[in-house]
Amino acid sequence: MPKSRIRKKADYTPPPSKQATSIKLTSRGWVAPVMLAMFVIGLAWIVVFYVTDGSLPIDSLGNWNIVVGFGFIAAGFGVSTQWK
């Protein structure tokens, strides 16, 4: 029975080195102030509603004032997704 040939192994060549590329993380200047303002406005809206027993900020909304306050807070979280 004939012997099979041994295949010559290819010489090891290391992969080319990757150069680190700097990523520009340019955050928009307006994002952080708007985000914090939305959080504070939402929190203040809810606190004022509870402290005044529902007569402020908008009396005709009634308990929907809580939804408005949480809406401001949710908008703050929405704006926070733009922060880099």
Curated annotation (Swiss-Prot):
Keywords: Cell cycle, Cell division, Cell membrane, Membrane, Transmembrane, Transmembrane helix
Subcellular location: Cell membrane
Entry GO CC: plasma membrane
Gene Ontology process terms (BP): cell division
Membrane-related topology note: Multi-pass membrane protein
Record flagged with keyword Transmembrane helix: yes
Stretches that traverse the bilayer: 31-51, 61-81
Keyword field contains Cell inner membrane: no
Annotated InterPro entries: CrgA
Region (Disordered), start-end ranges: 1-20
Extracellular side: 52-60
Induction of synthesis: Expression peaks immediately before the appearance of aerial hyphae.
Function of the protein: Involved in cell division. Coordinates growth and cell division. May act as an inhibitor of Z-ring formation.
Family classification: Belongs to the CrgA family.
HAMAP family reported in the protein's UniProt record: CrgA
The protein's name: Cell division protein CrgA
Protein's gene: crgA
